[in-house]
Amino acid sequence: MKGEFQKRAGFVLLACLAAHSDGIPDEQFRRYLPVLEWGATDERNFVQKGVSWALRMVGLQSPGMRRACGKLAQKLAKSDRASARWVGKEALREFERKR
């Protein structure tokens, strides 16, 4: 259980950075997309929620990041892993609402 919350904490920090920091270049956030893709395959509920939050917040940074995160969300939504599908679909719903 401890590792689950440590892993979630990393994703939550990324979400908070994206939500509360202005002026960070897209390239800084783009580096974390492979990490988000990797984290989305974790079946643990709290980790999934952390990844979902981070992906959604990073995607709201700029139009370019929305496109990049949207592509990742579409890829995850088609995954054969249930956790990745959930993260992808959740992010796509958020991006549709925020248009």
What are these regions, as identified by a protein language model?
Residues 1-99:
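Alpha-helical scaffold domains
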